[in-house]
A protein has these predicted regions:
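Glycine-rich phosphate/pyrophosphate-handling loop used in enzymes and phosphotransfer proteins
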Residues: 1-246
Length: 246
């Protein structure tokens, strides 16, 4: 699949030259001058960016993020999610990998926070899965779509802080079988290491999971995912997002 993905991305670049989400110059989906917006926290120590240690949702060992949900970062995430600009998954996923590698905490597998299957069919892809696949590739970790949404939920941005946890409580479950790809034409130039040569009945048991999402606000969605993973036998769960919205 990797050669086909490279050809597909090359064809896309030739037919529709990328325009930078930050400065609108043609050439790259996020140019070299605008990419530093993704790394504003790169030199900071790992910790508890949502607030005090007690504010981390209990199922998560750690929660981190790359940049504030403002300016260039906000535009890039919006264009990936709503404008079909899949090429942005490459710089966004690479930023996630850089941040996680810098704080040096570790993980065994990378798992994306899934959108509901109906929404993925309408959009044509899952933006968090595209980001997570690139991050897994750069971290040289297995990429596993281990979670699914068992029910549709209201978009978190439409809810207040107090309603977000209730909205996603019990919404996620671990898939019966693991997979090494998103099921679509992702942006990565090569495959991430596979978890096993054949599907596993429980891809998370005994493993430290790194959850990847596009945006985190209260951490409720990541916490709900972590709960499902821990109940399925995951050893520990950490979370990271491209951006944090306050």
């Amino acid at each position: 699949m990797a050669p086909l993905r490279r050809l597909a991305n090359l064809g896309l670049d030739l037919a529709f030259p990328a325009t930078c989400a930050g400065c609108q110059r043609e050439g790259e989906p996020l140019c070299a001058a605008c990419r530093p917006a993704l790394d504003v926290r790169l030199g900071l120590p790992g910790g508890t960016p949502i607030g005090l240690p007690a504010e981390i949702p209990i199922p998560l060992l750690q929660l981190d993020w790359c940049a504030p949900f403002t300016g260039t970062v906000r535009t890039a995430l919006h264009d990936l999610k709503y404008a079909g600009e899949r090429r942005l998954a490459n710089p966004l996923g690479a930023a996630v990998a850089r941040r996680w590698a810098r704080i040096g905490v570790g993980a065994d597998i990378v798992v994306p926070v899934p959108i509901h299957a109906d929404r993925e069919r309408r959009r044509g892809y899952d933006q968090a899965a595209l980001i997570a696949e690139v991050a897994a590739r750069d971290l040289r970790l297995p990429f596993v779509c281990a979670l699914e949404r068992g029910r549709a939920t209201v978009a978190q941005f439409e809810l207040g802080r107090d309603d977000r946890a209730a909205n996603v409580e019990g919404a996620f479950r671990v898939r019966g079988r693991g997979t090494g790809n998103t099921g679509g034409t992702g942006p990565s130039p090569g495959p991430s290491p596979s978890l096993n040569p054949s599907p596993s009945p429980n891809p998370v048991r005994g493993r430290w999971v790194l959850l990847v999402d596009d945006v985190v606000t209260t951490g409720s969605t990541l916490a709900a995912c972590a709960t499902a993973l821990i109940q399925a036998g995951a050893l520990a769960v950490s979370g990271i997002a491209v951006a944090r919205e306050r």
